[in-house]
Regions:
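Thiol/disulfide oxidoreductase modules built on the thioredoxin-like
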Residues: 428-492
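Structural microenvironment flanking redox-active thiols in thiol-disulfide oxidoreductases
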Residues: 371-412, 420-433, 451-454
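N-terminal "domain-start" segment that seeds a small globular fold
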Residues: 307-349, 441-445, 488-491, 495-496, ...
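A short beta-strand-turn-helix
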Residues: 337-357, 381, 456
Length: 517
């Protein structure tokens, strides 16, 4: 008898019991309905089912824990928590949430009343806020309404604390806790009662920002609250929007996550994508540093940490990454050793003893270049040259472009440095590269470098014109700026901000010279 019981225990212990999600929708015609899921703030179809005789069911074992929703015809839907349990609801439209009753689900016996309560309190506060908006802040009526609003808010906080304290083992508790703010203690004071650190509250808040979020629980990613907190933490309210600052906090945060988790996937993916789209000059460094650390550098297992990215995507993400990192603000780019218009003299920009150096890449056949290059010459003659600002321009001069390049320089009387891979240099270097570039580290007496001969790749030049502004140490301080922005910036940097501007902002030119590849 004992052996038979043991056999049955072993047999049934190997069976995975799937969770059933059952919904009864009263007075609803047979139709197709969808289960929806979150990944951050984005909604996706999780499953599709057929509502027949008012009932539809889904296999819960196919779903990740978190917030799910049932999408009805007419884009009506209601949300609920799924956490590896059977669920059975009954409801009726059009107010599916308001009419919802729960036959089975421990999580939602807590969650559904909570969101109904939050909805009602939010409505009350909205009405009181509208009444208060038209009143004098010193009036008794204004103060009375403020008291009512505060009382409602206190009631919400008390409700949340009750869930957090009495249902700690449930996912609903973790979701509610994630939505609450960290409590900040009073700032320390000295013997005289004066605050020791005026930044204490801000520093404490940032340091403890994630205290109410269980970063080990992937279910919290399947919820817009986590995304909103991530977005706020890396925004201007929590840190200076400087590439080095953001990168530092991004590394600290992501390195502290389980590298095989959805929490890691979402956080790394969002930070990388978000700062890759940033319009703030210099923030591309965050994007590139994130790529370098989490996508393009293998871990100890010899694999990319970005386990969610398909193999076919890595080439695009990681192509030319090392060069791109040398083109970020604060970095010193590769020197360029090229020929001048005589096709005899080698020139480079590291040797320029200038306070600022403008690297300017252009093409004599480029329509925008035909407008911007003469403007740059005007600035050089009338402002920059006398202020020890040099321009090192690199033009396209291979094949027929060599003659066009020289003709444009001559006709527009360009007096700044004009360099290029000339047609002869291109041909000779292609036939006998050993005469021009080092074949091994430390090899002496070679006039140029592989980076110079491949300058388009080195400087990521796939459209022209393109500008880099370097300081006296030849470090990049600005890039992809227009002629008017260049003039304004250099006037300001050298204390001439009150000088009349030769070139006012040109929206078309600005857009062309600022666009990302």
């Amino acid at each position: 008898m004992k052996s038979a019981f043991l056999f049955l225990f072993i047999m049934f212990s190997g069976i995975t019991l799937s969770q059933n999600l059952k919904f009864t929708i009263k007075n609803q015609k047979d139709t197709t309905v969808h289960l929806i899921k979150y990944f951050g703030t984005k909604k996706f179809y999780a499953d599709t089912g057929e509502l027949k005789n008012g009932v539809v069911q889904f296999d819960g074992s196919k779903q990740a824990n978190g917030i799910l929703g049932l999408l009805m015809p007419g884009q009506k839907y209601f949300e609920f928590i799924y956490n590896n349990e059977d669920i059975e609801f009954t409801t009726e439209g059009p107010d599916y949430l308001g009419n919802l009753t729960i036959q089975k689900s421990d999580e939602n016996n807590v969650f559904i009343p909570y969101i109904k309560f939050i909805g009602s309190q939010k409505s009350k506060m909205g009405q009181l806020g509208k009444q208060r908006a038209s009143l004098d802040a010193e009036s008794d009526e204004y103060k009375a309404l403020t008291t009512q609003i505060n009382e409602i808010n206190e009631g919400v906080v008390a409700y949340q604390k009750n869930i957090i304290n009495n249902h700690a083992e449930k996912l609903v508790s973790k979701i509610v806790k994630m939505s609450t703010e960290v409590l900040i203690p009073e700032a320390p004071v000295d013997a005289n009662g004066d605050i020791i650190d005026s930044n204490f509250r801000f520093t404490y808040y940032r340091k403890h920002f994630w205290d109410n979020v269980d970063l080990t629980n992937d279910a919290l990613v399947n919820n817009p609250i986590f995304h909103n907190k991530l977005e706020y933490f890396f925004g201007q309210n929590m840190m200076i929007q400087h590439w080095d600052t953001v990168t530092k906090f991004a590394f600290e945060f992501c390195d502290g996550l389980n590298p095989t988790s959805k929490m890691f996937e979402y956080s790394v993916g969002w930070i990388t994508s978000s700062f890759g789209k940033s319009k703030i000059m210099g923030m591309d460094k965050v994007y590139l540093e994130m790529l370098n650390r989490y996508y393009c550098t293998n871990n100890l297992e010899g694999e990319s940490p970005a386990f969610w990215v398909g193999e076919d995507k890595f080439e695009d993400l990681c192509d030319n990454l090392k060069n791109k990192l040398r083109l970020t603000i604060g970095s010193k780019p590769f020197n360029l050793y090229l020929k001048d218009t005589s096709d005899q003299v080698w020139v480079d920009f590291y040797s320029l003893n200038s306070d600022y150096t403008i690297l300017y890449f252009w093409d004599p056949e480029c329509g925008h270049c035909k407008k911007t290059t003469p403007k740059l010459e005007t600035l050089y003659k009338e402002k920059f040259k006398a202020r020890n600002i040099e321009i090192f321009s690199v033009g396209k001069a291979i094949g027929d472009d060599f003659g066009k390049w020289k003709k444009f320089i001559r006709e527009n009387k360009l007096t700044f440095i004009n360099a290029a891979i000339t047609d002869r240099l291109y041909t000779d270097a292609k036939e006998t590269p050993e005469k021009f570039v080092p074949l091994y580290p430390g090899e002496p007496n070679k006039p140029t470098t592989l980076e110079s001969l491949n300058y388009q790749n080195t400087y990521d030049i796939f459209s022209t014109p393109k500008v880099f502004l370097l300081d006296k140490d030849k470090k990049i301080i600005a890039k992809s700026i227009s002629i008017s922005q260049l003039e304004e910036m250099l006037d300001r940097l050298q204390g001439f901000e009150d000088l009349p501007k030769l070139f006012p902002p040109d929206p078309e030119e600005d857009a062309q010279m600022q666009k990302k590849e």
